[in-house]
C-alpha cells in the first residue's frame, strides 16, 4: 500500500514569482483526498511536484507504493497503446522503449537477435505482458474490443470521455498503489461520473485528485485539501461539511487578523507615548526600550494568515440580434453517429446538448462552427447575422499555444494594452498576461477562451463542456454571463447543476436518434462502439 507525505513545500514559477509556500499535508494509506481551490492556484503544479515532474524550491515529498498519474490534458497524436502506456509504471515504459529499439535493430546477425531476446526478457520481468492482460480487460470494458484490435488505433478517434475512461480503468486496475488524478471526471458523461465515484469508493488505493465536480467530491473524497493564497489547509471531513468549515475558517482568520491589528496599534501607541515621556524623564527610558523591542519582535513574527480573497470574475458576453431562426437542420445525419434529424433553433434560445460519450454531441457543435470539418448528410444553415463562436472541449488551440494572453488580445482584436489588461482583470487573468497559453492551468485556459468569445462579439455560442475545468466561482460567473447574453447558446454538458438553467435539451440517444426534450434526460447507457 502507499501514502503521500508533503512537508514545508515551496515552489516558484520560472519568472521567480512564488506560487506555493509552507505546504504540508499527508494522505494516508487508502485515503481519498481531493485538492480544491481557484483556477491557477497551484493544484496541478502540486500534483506535478508530487509526481516528480517539477523540482520544489524547498521542502520534502515522500511517497510509497508507486505513483500512477493521470494528467489534465492528453496529447491527441497517440495510439490507444501509447495512451495506456502513458499511465504505466516507469519501468514498463523503459522496457517498452528498449524492446522497440531492439526490434527496430533486428537483423540476421546473432548479436541483434540476442539483444532482442534480452529485451523481451526484460519486458517480461518488468511486468509488461502482465500489464497487457490488464489493458485487454480495460479496452474490452471501455471500448468493447480487445487490446490487440485497438492498440494501434489513433487515440484522437476516441471521444474525450472514452480516453479518460480507458486511462482510469488502467490506473485503477494497475500495479501502482498511489494515484494522482488531475480532473479525472472531465469529459465523462453522467454514467461515467457515477462509475468513477463508485470505483473510487471501492478501491483500496490511495488517491489524491483534483476536481470541481461537487457531486463527485461529496461521494468519493473523505478529506478536502484546499489550495489558496499560496498554501494549503486540510479539512478532515468530507465535502458535505466543507463549505461550512471554509466559512468558519475564514471568520476565524479574520478575527485573528483583527486582534493582531488591534495589538499592533496598541504597541505602536505605547512606544509613541513612552518615547515622549522618555524625552523628559530618563527613568522611563528603559520602559521605552523594552516597548520598542516588544514591537520589533511582534512585527518580525508578522500578522496571521489573512482570510482568502474571494474571486470576482465578471463575464460580459454581448452577442447581438440575428434572424429569428438561428440554426436550421434538415435531415441532418452525422456520419456513423446519428440517424437523420430535423432541428430549428430560435434566436435567444439556450439549449443544452446531452447524451453519452461518443454519441456525436461534440461533432455536432464542430459542424455548426465549420460545416466542412465534419462528414455529414442533409443540410445545416445558420440564420442571418449568425456568427458562431466555438469553445473547444479539449482546449486544443495550436493558434494560441505559444502566445501570451496580452499579445493574443492586442493583436487579434486591435485593442490597446490597457484595454487588454482591463479585460484580463475581469477574468482574474491579469497575473498570467505574459504566460504562454499552453502553460496556463486548464481553468485559466477555459476562462481565456470565454473572454475571446466575448471580445469576438459572436452571436451563436457553441460551448463544448465549458465548465469542465472551471472552479465553482468561475462556473457561476459563466452562468451569470450566459443569462445576460443577447444571443443563442448551444452547450454540450454533463454538468447537471449547469444544465438546470437551460430552456430545452437536445438529446443524442444511444441508438443514434436525436430528439428535443423540455427536461434534462441523462442517458444511463453508453453507445456500443461502432454503432
Question: Where do the model's predicted regions map?
Answer:
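Non-transmembrane amphipathic alpha-helical segments
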Residues: 95-103, 119, 260, 264-274, ...
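ABC ATP-binding cassette signature C-motif
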Residues: 1-253, 321-531
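Alpha-helical segments in transporter systems
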Residues: 120-123, 284, 312-318
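Amphipathic heptad-repeat alpha-helical coiled-coil/stalk segments that mediate oligomerization
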Residues: 303-328
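ABC transporter TMD-NBD coupling linker
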Residues: 291-309
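A short, surface-exposed helix-loop junction/capping segment
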Residues: 112-122, 268-278, 310
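ABC ATPase nucleotide-binding domains
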Residues: 253-274, 278, 282-293, 525-531
Amino acid at each position: 500500500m502507499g501514502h503521500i507525505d508533503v512537508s514545508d513545500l515551496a515552489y516558484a514559477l520560472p519568472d521567480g514569482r512564488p506560487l506555493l509556500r509552507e505546504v504540508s499535508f499527508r494522505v494516508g494509506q487508502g485515503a481519498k483526498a481531493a485538492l480544491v481551490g481557484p483556477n491557477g492556484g497551484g493544484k496541478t503544479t502540486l500534483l506535478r511536484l508530487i509526481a516528480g515532474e517539477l523540482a520544489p524550491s524547498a521542502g520534502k515529498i515522500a511517497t510509497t507504493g508507486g505513483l500512477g498519474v493521470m494528467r489534465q490534458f492528453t496529447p491527441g497524436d497517440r495510439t490507444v497503446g501509447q495512451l495506456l502506456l502513458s499511465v504505466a509504471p516507469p519501468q514498463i515504459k523503459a522496457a517498452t522503449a528498449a524492446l522497440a529499439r531492439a526490434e527496430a535493430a533486428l537483423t540476421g546477425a546473432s548479436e541483434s537477435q540476442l539483444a532482442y531476446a534480452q529485451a523481451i526478457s526484460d519486458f517480461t520481468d518488468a511486468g509488461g505482458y502482465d500489464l497487457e492482460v490488464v489493458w485487454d480487460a480495460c479496452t474490452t470494458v471501455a471500448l468493447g474490443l480487445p487490446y490487440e484490435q485497438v492498440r494501434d488505433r489513433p487515440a484522437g478517434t476516441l471521444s474525450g470521455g472514452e480516453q479518460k475512461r480507458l486511462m482510469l480503468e488502467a490506473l485503477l486496475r494497475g500495479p501502482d498503489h498511489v494515484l494522482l488524478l488531475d480532473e479525472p471526471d472531465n469529459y465523462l458523461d453522467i454514467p461515467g461520473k457515477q462509475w468513477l465515484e463508485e470505483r473510487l469508493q471501492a478501491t483500496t488505493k490511495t488517491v489524491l485528485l483534483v476536481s470541481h465536480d461537487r457531486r463527485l467530491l461529496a461521494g468519493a473524497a473523505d478529506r478536502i485539501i484546499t489550495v489558496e493564497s499560496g498554501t494549503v489547509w486540510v479539512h478532515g471531513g468530507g465535502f458535505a461539511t466543507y463549505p461550512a468549515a471554509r466559512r468558519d475558517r475564514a471568520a476565524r482568520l479574520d478575527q485573528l487578523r483583527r486582534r493582531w491589528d488591534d495589538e499592533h496599534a496598541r504597541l505602536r501607541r505605547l512606544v509613541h507615548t513612552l518615547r515622549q515621556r522618555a524625552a523628559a524623564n530618563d527613568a522611563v527610558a528603559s520602559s521605552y526600550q523594552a516597548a520598542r523591542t516588544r514591537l520589533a519582535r511582534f512585527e518580525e513574527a508578522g500578522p496571521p494568515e489573512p482570510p482568502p480573497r474571494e474571486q470576482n470574475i465578471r463575464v460580459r458576453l454581448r452577442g447581438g440580434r440575428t434572424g429569428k431562426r438561428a440554426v436550421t437542420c434538415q435531415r441532418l445525419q452525422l456520419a456513423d453517429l446519428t440517424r437523420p434529424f430535423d432541428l430549428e433553433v430560435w434566436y435567444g434560445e439556450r439549449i443544452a446538448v446531452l447524451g453519452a460519450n461518443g454519441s456525436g454531441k461534440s461533432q455536432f457543435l464542430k459542424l455548426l462552427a465549420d460545416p466542412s470539418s465534419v462528414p455529414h448528410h442533409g443540410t445545416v444553415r445558420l440564420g442571418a447575422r449568425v456568427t458562431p463562436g466555438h469553445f473547444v472541449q479539449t482546449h486544443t488551440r495550436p493558434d494560441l499555444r505559444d502566445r501570451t494572453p496580452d499579445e493574443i488580445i492586442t493583436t487579434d482584436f486591435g485593442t490597446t494594452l490597457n484595454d487588454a489588461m482591463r479585460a484580463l482583470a475581469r477574468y482574474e487573468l491579469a497575473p498570467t498576461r505574459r504566460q504562454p497559453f499552453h502553460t496556463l492551468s486548464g481553468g485559466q485556459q477555459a476562462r481565456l477562451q470565454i473572454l475571446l468569445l466575448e471580445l469576438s462579439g459572436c452571436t451563436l455560442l457553441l460551448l463544448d463542456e465549458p465548465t469542465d475545468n472551471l472552479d465553482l466561482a468561475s462556473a457561476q460567473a459563466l452562468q451569470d454571463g450566459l443569462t445576460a447574453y443577447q444571443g443563442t447558446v448551444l452547450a454540450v454538458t454533463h454538468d447537471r447543476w449547469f444544465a438546470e438553467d437551460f430552456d430545452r435539451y437536445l438529446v443524442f440517444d444511444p441508438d443514434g436518434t436525436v430528439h428535443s426534450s423540455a427536461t434534462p434526460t441523462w442517458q444511463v447507457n453508453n453507445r456500443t462502439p461502432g454503432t
